[in-house]
Design a protein with these regions (language model features):
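His-Asp phosphorelay/catalytic-motif detector in bacterial-type signaling
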Residues: 47, 72-80
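C-terminal output helix
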Residues: 107-117
């Protein structure tokens, strides 16, 4: 059974994620701030952190960067991190933070479950909805 730590200061978002992911193969835990995420990961046994980009004083980017730093000198076991992005422009932040994956809000249950499964298999996951779409207008294409 894999342990997934949901990190958000919004109870509604944590409940929404729990409803999407809860099942017999996942143990779901919750944290309301970045410090609690770091503390729980240091204790060990967390396979995936799903973190909201905007969490009080320590959001997903800071959490991810700190975890990568601590992993580098053995303070915690390596853990996959999935960021929940507020808008398409946040993809740059997700990539800079070395997150293993990201999903852009609004959250779609199927997409979130696919991302979590991929990350738990050791793969990366990028939500494709951030990419610009090409729209055909008459005889020309517009982006």
């Amino acid at each position: 059974m894999a342990t997934v730590l949901l990190a958000s200061d919004l109870g509604t978002l944590r409940r929404e994620l729990r409803d999407m992911l809860e099942g017999p193969d996942l143990l779901i835990e919750e944290a309301t701030n970045g410090r609690d995420v770091l503390k729980r990961v240091r204790e060990g046994g967390v396979d995936l952190v799903v973190a909201d980009l905007q969490i009080g004083s320590m959001g997903a980017m800071a959490i991810c960067l700190e975890l990568r730093h601590e992993e580098s000198y053995g303070a915690c076991d390596p853990v996959a991190v999935m960021m929940l992005l507020d808008r398409r422009a946040d993809v740059f932040l997700a990539r800079r933070s070395t997150a293993d994956g990201f999903v852009v809000k609004p959250l779609e249950p199927l997409k979130v479950r696919q991302a979590v499964r991929a990350l738990l298999r050791g793969e990366s996951y990028e939500d494709e909805t951030w990419r610009p779409t090409t729209v055909r207008v008459g005889a020309t294409n517009a982006e």
